[in-house]
Amino acid sequence: TDKSAIDMWTKELIHQHIDRSLTRMKTDYLDLVQLHSCSKEILERGEVIEALLEAQTAGKTRFVGYSGDNEAAVWAVNSGYFDTLQTSFSIPDQHARTNLFEPAHARKMGIITKRPIANGAWRSAINPTANLRYRPMRVYGDEYFRRAQLMAGLGPISGEPEDRFLTAIGFVLAHSDVTTAIVGTQNPSHMQDNIERVKHGSSLLSTIVEELQRRFDRLDDDWGQLT
């Protein structure tokens, strides 16, 4: 981590950001304040954690959390300082299942999964031509798509829903350690549609969940979490 990156993560700046959020939201306290994707090195310095705990003691936030992946997320979970973990988890990004869920659950942390549908990678991988408009465009989206293609290439899965969104979100929600999942959208109608689809069809057969886990484990070639 270079000096400029470290200088972004100071106790003073953390306090400034929390106070600014309180002012903007016109509230006396926040329910949750999370550190987003700071490195393991910065966590180990302790300054940002001290800032969060001071804010919590002062009543400015009820809970404190860490949002991130891989070794930094492992450190955050094992530290015992955080109430929540927000981390990447999806069909083509499953390392949280083997590295994070169990220790986080043991510490009674809330687990918030980010990118649960992986930019639509599973839907696109099944039929790339027909679903071209769903093709992930960001760099990490391309990696999701590559992994999903490899997993889908092992053949059809018996009983899988025709709507591959339900496969993607159902896979994440099938893991009992998951507290909630964040599905990003810029369109309120898409959000409402997603809610209705989850209400009426997100439960997956255990055989489908197990097959998707098996495929990831079989193909995993150091497929680390994508931040």
Where do the model's predicted regions map?
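Hydrophobic/aromatic residues located in beta-strands of well-ordered beta-sheets
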Residues: 1, 63-64, 111, 181
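Glycine/proline-rich, positively charged
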Residues: 2-95, 99, 174
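Structured C-terminal cap/extension of enzyme domains
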Residues: 79, 99-227
